[in-house]
Amino acid sequence: MQEFSLSTLLEMTVGLASGANNEERFHRLLDAVRKAVICDCVVLMSLHNDTLTPLAMQGLTRDTLGRRFVVSEHPRLAQICSADLPVRFAADCPLPDPFDGLLLDSEDDLPMHSCMGLPLHFGEQLLGILTLDSLKPDAFDHLSPRSLEILAAIAAATLKMTLTFSELENQAKQTQLRLEELNQEAWSRDSVEIIGNSGPMLAMKADIDVVAPSQFNILIHGETGVGKELVARTIHQRSNRKRQPLVYVNCAAIPENLLESELFGHVKGAFTGADRARMGKFALADGGTLFLDEIGELPLSAQSKILRALQNHEIQPVGQDRVQTVDVRILAATNRDLKKEVEAGRFRADLYHRLSVYPIYVPPLRERKGDLSLLAGYFVEQARRKLGITQLKLHGDVLSQLIQYPWPGNVRELEHVINRAALKAKARQRGRPVTTLKVEDLGELQGPRAAMVEPTAQDEPMLGEWIGELGLRDATDEFQRHLISETLTQADFNWAEAARRLQTDRANLTRLAKRLGITVSRSHSIERSR
């Protein structure tokens, strides 16, 4: 049995505490481990609840960092986590290796022949694990148990030190943030996670860190599909209201005649059909946070009522004489430029200033292409779990294909593309131990324009007339009328199918169609009132 020399141990410990950041400290640790133990790949993971999160890795595809490994779903990881001492798996062990097929610079489904895992304990607490894999059988048999215990102790001390630094930083900022390494934010297993380390995402996360603990109203703005609701949930989770409700309202989905009742509630008998009293969204969010999604779609009449609630912190349910006080923090989201809407007279300036005390911009995916590998890995692991696939990996050409695509539907579109591709890959490779998601599984990457019919020669002059004779708003409305009408016709006048093709939800589509004067007659024909 081989023991580590004193010089090897000193080399492993020197400099581990001097890294400029968590990522650098962890990679120094992995560099030292690979000098001491020859292996093809090594992964450091932290444990939270029943989920292992990769903090740093060497030798595996980069999308591995975006994956989350539920311990109960991976027998080898479960065995390592439940052990007190390092675990070595036999070359013929039947348990699946979670990293099979993920070896860097290899398109083959190469299995790992040697696998070893070190539980990282600090006192009685299991902080995480360190895994080492090799394509060479019996690669770790020569290492003595004592050497592996020392290696585990050094790794655990490094991980504990780094986690402690993060905890102290969190306390200094007076937030409830549980910071994971690589500047990614994670909640508990049943929560959500903001993935990304690109410059625009780090700037957005910094804004969240600054404003979340405050009581300020926040305007979250960005394109459709960028994750504005996720940002709102993150802000609520970081605030001192996190133990109180977060109430969601889609402003575009509520008919105008029901808005007041939906937001402020009503008493029994307030109007026809009000057979019982009902609390409104403001009352339900009392003490917590109210998220007003698609705030830019509210009609002016509803905007004035919300403004009064924000100014006075009072609401008056429909049919009730007295007012009641509420303590609500407002988070609003929109994909519109509200400054321009104010200038055009479609949005109240006083409400805009009340809402945008601290605006947060959520960047589109095309501005954060550096996050694509992490996002792809995250969605691939989610798809693997949903579809019950033992192992799902990305072919090397897939990431380059994803990076070249402009992603008009942003992160939401990426998630849907990977889910569809994973389903196709599973059907095509049924029965294989490692399922590979290939370029052909992506299909034809198309954005919202895919739902449009090709313009005919007869149509083209009309499009030119829009540009020449209409203002921007009117031209946009006319284009939307044309697009919705054509899509409805192609979808056999099925609103749900048309909404799917246009990558929106049915409520938003019907509301927009109503504003544009589009209706479908009983004889299944498009009627326009404008």
Swiss-Prot record:
Q: Which Pfam families match?
A: GAF, Sigma54_activat
- Cite the entry's keywords alphabetically: ATP-binding, DNA-binding, Nucleotide-binding, Phosphoprotein, Repressor, Transcription, Transcription regulation, Two-component regulatory system
Name the InterPro entries on file: AAA+_ATPase, GAF, GAF-like_dom_sf, Homeodomain-like_sf, P-loop_NTPase, Sigma_54_int, Sigma_54_int_dom_ATP-bd_1, Sigma_54_int_dom_ATP-bd_2
- Identify the residues that bind ATP: 222-229, 285-294
Q: Which GO terms describe its biological process?
A: phosphorelay signal transduction system; regulation of DNA-templated transcription
Give the source's domain of life in one word. Bacteria
Annotated ranges, domain Sigma-54 factor interaction: 194-423
The UniProt entry, under SMART domains, shows: AAA, GAF
Keyword Lipoprotein annotated: no
The molecular function terms of the Gene Ontology recorded here are:
ATP binding; ATP hydrolysis activity; DNA binding
Q: What does this protein do?
A: Involved in the regulation of different processes depending on the cell density. Acts together with sigma-54 to repress, perhaps indirectly, some genes.
Q: Which NCBIfam families match?
A: PRK05022.1
PANTHER family, from UniProt? ANAEROBIC NITRIC OXIDE REDUCTASE TRANSCRIPTION REGULATOR NORR, TRANSCRIPTIONAL REGULATORY PROTEIN
Q: What is this protein called?
A: Regulatory protein LuxO
What organism is recorded for this protein?
Vibrio cholerae serotype O1 (strain ATCC 39541 / Classical Ogawa 395 / O395)
Taxonomic lineage per UniProt?
A: Bacteria, Pseudomonadati, Pseudomonadota, Gammaproteobacteria, Vibrionales
